[in-house]
């Protein structure tokens, strides 16, 4: 955001863009002799621009946040930066970070959830700056590709084909910008419902099917679903042109030595907010202009609540409206599993098995991650999309991991840990096309309730954090 030090320029700019009364600017300006910090600038900017934001006289409001993952803690951070002082964050588990989960094995942390980022993770960079964390100092990321049937190393995009893949990728983003300007922006408010069609169909419509060869690795193997099932909007918001380029070229990929969870541990330590772990919300009642939140420790009263926990479960403990029940029942999720193990012989590099990144091969390993190259006394993590509807159980997935690792030449020695994630809450194409997002966005602030978290943006930590940042900018 630009900070205007020249008052005349500020008046001219806002007058030209928003056609507001100069007197209003002058009145606001008298609150401070000069604009030297961001809080006063924002106060003036939002007063005269008539945006959704509340003014700073509300900083004593009691704010409750449900969930201490990236979405919840980022919301708390930006509230505190705006001057809010009475913030309570409830987290039902015994740790912060949500799907940023970095346990320890023999003195080093490994990843069971989010593992990487890149320079386009601007909000995460703001969080890191806030907590005094420098550039991520984790191990370098690299990978090879293996055949899903033989385990042999191969190149899924040959030299001759690479030119056509690059050409179609450029064409795809050019058409996207032309037909759906702003499609890659964070959140779904105002996004064309035409982008509710599945991503594979959009590629066919654009006559750019080969871009899927680049998208599939950082999308499907990371648990976000299949190209022919997921609404295209989710793909293009997560993998905008710049982010995809970073992932494909491996240009300055971020990996954190102490894990992604450490980001949120440090943030929770710095925040003045009251962060309550092991505090599952049992009931929320919104009445008489207040929000009453009940846990095992009793009932507390708040002025506002921000829900970053999964919205489809919200009606189980909220006094949910009929519309909340109807709309949140449409949210679906993926069954994403992570297996952690040692091996008898260690690989030198991580690997994708692209042939397993389809519904027909659900339960098979899509990628294994060798986090600490050259250090054999560490764990390998393998990632699998399950399929409970087809009867593929966690035991089936574990069995396939043993088989697939052996096929690749790295027999599993000992299973150390495993996690089944409720992953990427999202909508089916038909529900996205129905205008679900614009309807839910119209509820923001009603009943003193605000909705955030993965489903309102996307399932990676940058998108969820950026949405929380924008939510605070819009309404607080």
Regions from the PLM with identified roles:
Residues 371-476:
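Conserved flavin/dinucleotide-binding core of flavoenzymes
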Residues 5-15, 41-44, 48-51:
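N-terminal amphipathic/hydrophobic targeting modules at extreme N-termini
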Residues 82, 283-394:
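Mid-domain catalytic core of redox enzymes
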Residues 61-88:
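N-terminal Rossmann-like FAD-binding beta1-loop-alpha1 element of flavoenzymes
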Residues 99, 107-139:
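Conserved FAD-binding subdomain of flavin-dependent enzymes
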Residues 241-287:
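Helical element adjacent to the flavin cofactor pocket in flavoenzyme catalytic cores
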Residues 125, 129-130, 134-233:
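Mobile amphipathic helical/loop "lid" adjacent to a hydrophobic cofactor/ligand pocket
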Residues 80-104:
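Glycine-rich FAD pyrophosphate-binding loop
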């Amino acid at each position: 955001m630009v900070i205007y030090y020249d008052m005349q320029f500020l008046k001219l700019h806002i007058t030209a863009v928003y056609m507001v009364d100069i007197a209003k600017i002058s009145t606001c300006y008298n609150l401070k002799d000069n604009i030297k910090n961001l809080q006063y600038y924002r106060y003036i900017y939002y007063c005269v621009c008539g945006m959704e934001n509340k003014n700073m006289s509300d900083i004593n409001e009691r704010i409750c946040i449900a969930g201490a993952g990236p979405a919840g803690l980022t919301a708390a951070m930006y509230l505190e930066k705006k001057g809010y002082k009475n913030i309570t964050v409830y987290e039902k588990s015994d740790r912060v970070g949500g799907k940023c989960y970095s346990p320890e094995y023999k003195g080093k942390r490994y990843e069971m959830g989010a593992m990487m980022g890149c320079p386009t993770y601007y909000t995460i960079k703001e969080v890191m700056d806030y907590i005094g964390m420098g550039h991520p100092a984790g191990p370098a990321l690299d990978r090879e590709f293996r055949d899903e049937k033989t385990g042999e190393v191969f190149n899924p995009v040959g030299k001759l084909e690479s030119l056509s893949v690059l050409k179609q990728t450029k064409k795809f983003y050019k058409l996207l910008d032309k037909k759906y300007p702003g499609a890659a922006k964070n959140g779904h408010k105002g996004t064309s419902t035409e982008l509710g069609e599945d991503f594979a169909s959009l590629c066919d419509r654009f006559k750019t099917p080969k871009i899927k060869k680049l998208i599939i690795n950082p999308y499907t193997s990371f648990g976000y679903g299949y190209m022919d099932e997921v609404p295209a909007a989710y793909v293009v918001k997560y993998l905008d042109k710049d982010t995809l380029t970073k992932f494909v070229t491996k240009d300055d990929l971020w990996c954190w030595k102490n894990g992604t969870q450490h980001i949120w541990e440090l943030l929770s330590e710095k925040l003045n907010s009251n962060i309550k772990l092991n505090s599952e919300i049992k009931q929320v009642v919104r009445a008489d202009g207040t929000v009453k939140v009940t846990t095992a420790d009793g009932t507390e009263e708040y002025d506002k609540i921000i829900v970053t926990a999964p919205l489809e479960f919200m009606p189980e403990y909220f006094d949910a409206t009929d519309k909340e029940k109807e709309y949140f029942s449409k949210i679906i999720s993926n069954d994403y599993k992570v297996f952690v193990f040692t091996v008898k012989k260690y690989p030198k590099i991580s690997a994708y098995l692209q042939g397993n990144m389809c519904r027909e091969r659900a339960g098979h390993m899509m990628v294994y991650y060798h986090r600490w190259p050259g250090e054999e006394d560490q764990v390998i993590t393998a990632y699998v999309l399950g399929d409970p509807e087809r009867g593929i159980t966690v035991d089936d997935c574990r069995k396939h991991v043993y088989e697939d690792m052996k096929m690749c030449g790295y027999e599993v020695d000992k299973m150390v840990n495993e996690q089944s994630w409720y992953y990427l809450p999202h909508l089916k194409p038909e529900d996205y096309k129905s205008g679900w997002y614009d309807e839910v966005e119209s509820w923001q602030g009603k009943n003193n309730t605000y909705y955030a978290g993965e489903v309102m943006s996307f399932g990676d930590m940058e998108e969820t954090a950026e949405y929380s940042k924008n939510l605070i900018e819009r309404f607080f």
